[in-house]
Amino acid sequence: MASGAARWLVLAPVRSGALRSGPSLRKDGDVSAAWSGSGRSLVPSRSVIVTRSGAILPKPVKMSFGLLRVFSIVIPFLYVGTLISKNFAALLEEHDIFVPEDDDDDD
């Protein structure tokens, strides 16, 4: 479930057309927003901010991350992490690799 959500968050801008494969020249002479080409990075960047005539291009599409999206990712991963650490600590204690002692309060 979590990997599907992460995949959706990564691919959402690609499907919506927010990321393009480099600067392209439109029919009217405007240069579109660019993606840092050649597949090196998934982070969108904008190399051209003005048209040939000097007009400033509109703001790029902003992908908002609401609190619901953040918590829907953070809380499941925190829960899975605590389950893994709890089970690993029980495994270590079961095999006598690490057994906590209460004798540390002798100071």
From Swiss-Prot:
Motif (GXXXX[G/A/S]): 81-85
Record GO cellular component, one term: mitochondrial matrix
Coiled-coil regions listed: none
GO molecular function term, any single one: channel activator activity
Effect annotated for changing residue 81 to W: Abolishes calcium uptake into mitochondria
Membrane association type: Single-pass membrane protein
GO-annotated biological processes: calcium import into the mitochondrion; cellular response to calcium ion starvation; mitochondrial calcium ion homeostasis; mitochondrial calcium ion transmembrane transport
Localization per Swiss-Prot or TrEMBL: Mitochondrion inner membrane
Ranges of the Mitochondrial matrix topological domain: 54-65
Domain remark text: The GXXXX[G/A/S] motif at the C-terminal part of the transmembrane region mediates interaction with MCU and is required to activate the calcium-conducting pore in the uniporter complex. The poly-Asp region at the C-terminus mediates interaction with the polybasic region of MICU1.
Quaternary structure and interacting proteins, as annotated: Component of the uniplex complex, composed of MCU, EMRE/SMDT1, MICU1 and MICU2 (or MICU3) in a 4:4:1:1 stoichiometry. The number of EMRE/SMDT1 molecules is hovewer variable, ranging from 1 to 4 copies per uniplex complex, leading to uniplex complexes with distinct gatekeeping profiles. Interacts (via its C-terminal poly-Asp tail) with MCUR1; the interaction is direct. Unprocessed form interacts (via transit peptide) with MAIP1.
Protein name per the record: Essential MCU regulator, mitochondrial
Lineage per the UniProt record: Eukaryota, Metazoa, Chordata, Craniata, Vertebrata
Gene name for this UniProt entry: SMDT1
